[in-house]
Amino acid sequence: MNSRFLILAEGAFSPLRSKTANACIRYTPQQVVAVIDSTRAGDTAQKVLGFGGDIPVVSSLAEGLARKPNALLIGIAPPGGQLPASWRALILDAIDNRLEVWSGLHTILGDDPEFAARARNRGVAIHDLRKPPADLDIARGRVRELDDRATVILTVGTDCNIGKMTTQLQLRDAMKERGMRVSFAATGQTGILVEGWGISVDAVIGDFIAGAAERLTLQAAKDADIVLVEGQGSIIHPSYSGVTYGLLHGSLPHAMVMCAQPSRTAINNHPWVRIPPLAEFIDMQERAAAPLRSAPVIAVALNTYDLGDAEASAAIDRVQRETDLPATDPVRFDPSPIVEAIDAFHRKRFDGVRSSATLGAGAR
């Protein structure tokens, strides 16, 4: 992907409200020329997010065009994933300036007659990251075929937008540095943008969510010993738990990594849904997985972006005491505690597989 992205995040560029923009800036900063948000114009990505260096925030498309982009990236994923009406004219203007459009919205821009005709006339492409394949099927438990050759790790969380994708990408990079055979299965539009492939499971017909997760997991396992599946939502989320359960049942993880934010006590935008204490939540999560597979939570990834260094370290120590599990913030600190927990779990599994195979051969 040789895109030079101008990212549209008008009125929303921030640590929590511009997930797609933030991931693109964190993992492919060399492809970002600027971010459009008139409310933060003059700032840099570093000032807004704490990373991204001197990528500028500009006030308008016209100002961004001066930096020679060749693509416009929709940098937010609002609740419901619909295109803000106020952005329509800007996107058409971008197409008129021969920018490709990359979108992770539920609104499929390529199916919109006006956008499609304008893009066709200008000779540019529209990439809808959330558009699912047409040939999806139901899940059939086929991930069990991996039991003797790969370990599947799913990130789960106490809420949405809490670090499930970022944790897996941090772990993937750290594992590759150690020479481990690992792959990342993207299940959301932002992960697809970063990784270059995947299926946005929240855009899939309900009957096929687990089937999409199954397909992704099997595909990711072709050249990997460890498959890191990007989690979505939360089992207690009143809006998105259906996706969470479909992903859990389709990917059939062997183990899970719990993602949490120490300062978050209720589901975002649903303050009436309180988040249980973490040890209790972990028990709930393991019981949710148990009918199809016993899958323990083996580590905790914390999102401490809103805490000072001392507070973050104290939160990690507290979680380790309360859960008796390794914990860290894999972005702020070293992800090694989680990497080592996964590696130990994987080795223990396959010591057991080899022992069973040896016993079976002896019995014959």
List each language-model region with its residue ranges:
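N-terminal leader/targeting and accessory segments in enzymes
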Residues: N2-N121
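ATP-dependent carboxylate-amine ligase catalytic core
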Residues: S3-R4, E10-A12, S18, R26-Y27, ...
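C-terminal lobe/tail of nucleotide-utilizing enzymes
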Residues: F5-L8, A12-F13, Q31, D43-A62, ...
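Structural motif
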Residues: L6-L8, L73-G75, L154, I226-L228, ...
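Short, hinge-like loop/turn segments at secondary-structure boundaries
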Residues: G50-D54, E114-V124, R144-D147, I199-V204, ...
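Flexible, glycine/proline-enriched loop segments at strand-loop-helix junctions
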Residues: W102-H106, L154-I162, I199-V204
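Conserved catalytic-core segment of NTP-binding enzymes
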Residues: T107-L109, P113-A116, R120, D128-L129, ...
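Walker A (P-loop) phosphate-binding motif
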Residues: R140-V182
